[in-house]
Amino acid sequence: MSLHSAIMKLEPIVEVYDNDIGVKLTYNGHNYYGFAYCHKEDKDFFSEKVGATIAHYRAMIKIYDDEIRRAEVAARVLWSAYKDVIYNSQNDGIPVDPTSAFITRVFKARDLVDRYKAQRASLRTQLREYLKNHEKCLESIRAQRKTENEDKNV
């Protein structure tokens, strides 16, 4: 199972604190938290669903951050071992086959890091789009309320 599908299958635990939302995801025995805070000027627009969605995205991004760190460490270890093999083969005079399974593992480890970064970037883009669309919705509601208040005052 890929990391992305594993993250999507996680069951979020949502907690509401006044007008702020917290989401907890448990992945590989670790807890990852995401929070969404409601601005004091937007308290009348508070929505638990919107806050939970934002907090859920943030928790998923934190899982990716952690997995990227782990994958980068593994890739660095493999790359370091490969450089040691190359260095030692130059001293021994024994040629190293660059198509070996080991170098393939090195490149696969690096590819995994790049794939995780692309998926994390996709999640961040989705979150930005969600926030931008939500802000457009709030702006239209504010404008409508402003015109309604002006009509009442006339």
Language-model segments: residues:
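Juxtamembrane, membrane-proximal amphipathic segments and lipid-exposed surfaces
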Residues: 150-154
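Catalytic phosphate/metal-binding cores of nucleic-acid and nucleotide-processing enzymes, i.e., regions
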Residues: 1-149
